[in-house]
Every structure is written in C-alpha cells, then in structure tokens.
C-alpha cells in the first residue's frame, strides 16, 4: 500500500508543479493547459482527473507530432539550400533513435509512476523535441 501511496503522491506533485509553472512553460504546455481547462468545463468537472489528462495529453502530442513533421520538412529544405544533405540525414537518424527512447522512457514512467504517464510523458517529450528541432533551424 505504501508503494501505491508514493506513486499517487508523485503523480499529484507532477500535476501540481505543472499547473504552478504554467505561465513560465513554453507553448507546449500552453496547448495542454488550454485543453485541460476546456475539457474540465465541457465535462462539467470540478478538477482534473485521469480521463482529462489522457484526452489532453493525446490531443497535444498529436499537435506536436504534426509540428515536428513541419519542422523536419523545413530542416530538409534548409539542408538542401545549404547543400548539406548529411545534416538532414543525421537529424533523421537521431529522430528515429529519439522515438525509440521516448517509447521506452514513457513505458517506464507509466509502469513506475502511474497510468496517466503513458500519455502525459510522450506529450512532454514531443514538446521538448519540437523546441529542440526548432533550434536547429536558427
């Protein structure tokens, strides 16, 4: 029972810290926060619950995945313009490795922290990756 309480505590702290720092977070958290607020209101809930986390994490991750594809397309164009095909090739190799890492890391988070992490963790990682790839354009 103590292990379960610890997991619940960690999960609660994750959500509380996310909301406490929402204004300082990047665009990635903003999309999630907006979804959470709208979903809570639409469903007439008093607070966030696992279903809201699941819905909004999935929605936001899907948004980031589309944006990542757009940024990768821009990197490809830029690499062609600069005649650096190896740059794009290297980034695509790291992208495949990154996807494998995220899948395993988030499976671990779901198993050890709790089921909401199966969707919340990938959303966080996709937001971070989007920001990282955008830096490659500058």
Regions found by a protein language model. Give the residues of each.
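Bacterial N-terminal signal peptides that target proteins for export
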Residues: 1-9
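N-terminal alpha-helical modules
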Residues: 22-138
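Hydrophobic helical h-region of N-terminal Sec-dependent signal peptides
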Residues: 9-15
């Amino acid at each position: 029972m103590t292990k379960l309480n610890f997991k619940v505590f960690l999960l609660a702290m994750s959500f509380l810290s996310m909301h406490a720092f929402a204004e300082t977070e990047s665009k990635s958290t903003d999309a999630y926060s907006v979804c959470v607020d709208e979903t809570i209101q639409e469903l007439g809930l008093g607070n966030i619950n696992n279903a809201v986390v699941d819905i909004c994490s999935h929605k936001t991750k899907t948004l980031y995945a589309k944006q990542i594809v757009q940024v990768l397309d821009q990197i490809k164009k830029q690499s062609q313009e600069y005649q650096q095909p190896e740059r794009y090739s290297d980034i695509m190799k790291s992208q495949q490795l990154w996807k494998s890492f995220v899948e395993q890391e988030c499976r671990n988070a779901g198993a050890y922290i709790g089921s909401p992490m199966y969707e919340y963790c990938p959303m966080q990682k996709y937001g971070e990756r989007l920001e990282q790839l955008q830096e490659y354009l500058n």
